Regions:
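Conserved N-terminal entry element of GNAT/NAT acetyltransferase domains
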Residues: 1-9, 137, 141
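Conserved acetyl-CoA-binding loop-helix of GNAT-fold acetyltransferases
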Residues: 75-88, 113
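Conserved active-site tyrosine of GNAT-family acetyltransferases
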Residues: 17, 111-112, 116
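Short hydrophobic/aromatic beta-strand element in the GNAT-like acyltransferase core
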Residues: 37-41, 52, 66, 132
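Conserved GNAT acetyl-CoA-binding A-motif
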Residues: 90-103
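Conserved catalytic-core motifs of GNAT/GCN5-like acyltransferases
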Residues: 99-101, 117-134
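A short, internal acetyl-CoA/4′-phosphopantetheine-binding micro-motif in the GNAT/acyltransferase core
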Residues: 67-74
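A conserved beta-strand-loop-helix scaffold within acyl/acetyltransferase catalytic domains
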Residues: 31-32, 44-46, 53-62, 67
Length: 141
């Protein structure tokens, strides 16, 4: 047995590791419900992206991985539309709940306004004085 360290993980190494992990997890989970990205985007008339959301279905949950809204339209309701549209699509795909994490300098109040409730906060992440907040929305409608 040999132990190695790398700072340049290859696609092959990552896939080999994930194949083993998925095989183990398949004993406990229906992995067919752990697939399918959900992307929702807003663009202007010439195609420039003004905002977007990327999430993934994991069982009964929509995991929101990324949400961004351009300064040009921030505060106009675009973010709320992105969340609502993603939740509607996730529900159509079988999801019942949603999970998101956000940094203290990002969007916790926005998510709470959308009905998400704080589950926990990790202090001093990624740096001292900052937090990473985990929020969930149960039984979204």
């Amino acid at each position: 047995m040999h132990l190695s360290i790398t700072h340049a993980v290859t696609a092959q190494e990552k896939e080999e590791l994930l194949t083993g992990l998925r095989a183990y997890n398949a004993q406990f989970l229906d992995l067919s419900t752990f697939s399918g990205d959900i992307g929702v985007y807003v663009r202007d008339d010439i195609g420039t992206m003004l905002g977007g959301l990327i999430g993934v279905r994991k069982g009964d949950w929509l995991n929101i991985d990324f949400l961004w809204v351009s300064d040009a339209v921030r505060g106009s309701g675009v973010g709320s539309q992105l969340i609502k549209t993603a939740e509607d699509e996730a529900r159509r795909k079988g999801c019942k709940h949603a999970l998101v994490d956000t940094a203290s300098f990002q969007a916790r109040p926005f998510y709470e306004k959308q009905g998400y409730q704080l589950q926990m906060s990790l202090q001093d992440y990624p740096y001292p004085g900052m937090q990473r907040h985990y929020l969930a929305k149960r039984e979204f409608r």
